Amino acid sequence: ENTTPFNPRDAFGSHSDSDHVYNTPRAWYMQRFLNPYDEVWDGPDADHKPTSDDIPWARQPERKVTIEDIKYVLSSHYQGTPFDPYGQLGDERTRHMYRTIGINRQSQLAVMQIRPYRPQASRAIQWMAYGSNPFNTLVPFFPNVDTTPAYLEDTTTRVTSENFYWANRIIAALCDGAFRSTSNAVERYQEKTGAMGHRLVAATDE
């Protein structure tokens, strides 16, 4: 009896019209970023396009993935393509054609880092960001702790820059409508806090 290989995408996925706006383009961009040299991603002769129904179900990235890579992918808005709503490529039609991964309705992002080379008590780190991913920043938390600094530990009922959640919400509200003039400042904020997070983790490990 002839059989065909099991295809999990066909078995568990869908190919609806809404997928071609909300889901498939995001899978295309993630794989385009993590596997840029595996295939041709752009142009009329691209192996896969944003609406292709045969984008691989899973694939191994071309290099080891960092915390920053995960943050970039989950904050992405089709940078470097005509589909970026903040970009200058394409036109008004293409810039609003597909739903981005990073959107203003996001509330929080968590990235789990398991470090097998560390003792059990400090092996895991949970990197957390609050608010809209294109404008927020990741900070590291050790899960095996009893208390967290007040600035980080909750979401207050009062909007204030003295709370990490609301500080990132405020940044997004101020920068979303002025992306081109504020993106460099947001990127510096993300890089500085990320570097400080890695430095604090390294100091704690010592």
Describe every region a protein language model picked out.
Residues 1-206:
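C-terminus-biased signal that marks the final domain/tail of proteins
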